[in-house]
Curated annotation (Swiss-Prot):
Source species: Arabidopsis thaliana
Lineage of origin: Eukaryota, Viridiplantae, Streptophyta, Embryophyta, Tracheophyta
InterPro entries attached to this UniProt entry: MATH-CC_domain_protein (IPR050804), MATH/TRAF_dom (IPR002083), TRAF-like (IPR008974)
Top-rank taxon: Eukaryota
Coiled-coil segments: 231-287
Protein name, as recorded: MATH domain and coiled-coil domain-containing protein At3g58250
Keywords: Coiled coil
Length: 303
């Protein structure tokens, strides 16, 4: 296992004794690409009771140590190496936003297990399976796992190179955002900027992904930032809109539940009424049916 020195965007993982593995899931060693710490997660028997494929995912390592609201956008590919020259390796590629709620992503059905384990497949050599992952980190929100050697100055704020482009665009769109910010300590300035970036990321998320606690924390952060001189009327407006949508969502779900209960009662009543109707129909049919000759000997005296 280890980084491919010829290409720092790649990592190779060799799984030994693949066919005889008993573990449901296994992890690779951690590795660093583009300042982010990763690891691979594999399910040798498939990540599904019905699966007959190798399942493989890219996982953000030590994600619990990253700040609230962290996200990273990455394009990556998995290659299952075939060692027979005339046969093709299996490669799949995808792109994903990794975040607190979804810190791993990949393919549940990567390659059929029967194909991997076939004697002449070329994928297993002495029982070893080689996987190569190639990653291109497109954007990072929140701190990296690995410190970058240099920070960049954007309007007096020291930010990571991966954050610089976004922070520059933020000042271009809102040039007066920090004109009244008076704190001089660079560590504190960087801290407040990171809080602002996390707050913006919270507002950008779908209301369905945001909890009431997230909103409460967001308003506390907003108040702290504005108290220290940030001009964030536009951000408060966005946060209020998210809150309104969240309230509408909650009200709508409550009403849906109420309507569902009412509908259940109505269906039960309809079922009872249908049963009563069927009974009345049967009684009516019985009432209008002609009397037979054997009915209680009523017609015996006439014959």
């Amino acid at each position: 296992m280890g980084n491919d020195q010829a290409d720092k965007k790649k990592f190779s993982w060799v799984i030994k004794n693949f066919s005889s593995l008993q573990s449901e899931k296994i992890y690779s060693d951690q590795f660093v690409i583009d300042g982010c710490r990763w690891r691979l997660l594999a399910f040798p028997k498939g990540n599904d009771t019905k699966s007959d494929h190798l399942s493989l995912y890219l996982d953000v390592a030590e994600s619990e140590s990253l700040p609230c609201g962290w996200r990273r956008h990455a394009q990556f590919s998995f290659t299952i190496v075939n060692h027979i020259p005339e046969k093709c390796s299996q490669r799949k590629e995808t792109i994903h936003w990794f975040c607190e709620k979804v810190s791993d992503w990949g393919f549940t059905n990567l390659v059929p297990l029967i194909e991997l384990k076939a004697e002449d497949s070329g994928f297993l050599v002495k029982g070893e399976l080689k996987i190569v992952v190639e990653i291109e980190v497109l954007e990072v929100i929140g701190l990296l796992n690995v410190s970058e050697s240099e920070s960049m100055d954007v309007n007096g704020f020291h930010v990571l190179p991966s954050q610089a482009k976004y922070v520059k665009s933020l000042f271009e769109i809102h040039p007066d955002i920090a004109t009244k910010f008076r704190i001089k300590n660079q560590y504190l300035k960087t801290g407040y900027m990171n809080v602002l970036l996390c707050l913006i990321e919270t507002v950008r998320r779908s209301p369905k992904e945001i909890s009431k606690n997230d909103l409460a924390d967001a308003y506390v952060a907003l108040e702290s930032l504005t108290d220290h001189g940030f001009k964030l009327d536009w951000l408060k407006k966005k946060l209020d809109q998210v809150t309104q949508k969240k309230e509408k969502e909650a009200a709508g779900e409550t009403r849906m539940h109420e309507i569902g209960e009412e509908l259940k009662d109505l269906k039960l009543k309809c079922s009872d009424l249908e049963a009563q109707l069927d009974k009345e129909k049967a009684d009516v049919l019985a009432a209008i049916a002609p009397l037979g000759s054997s009915d209680d000997g009523v017609f015996d005296d006439f014959f």
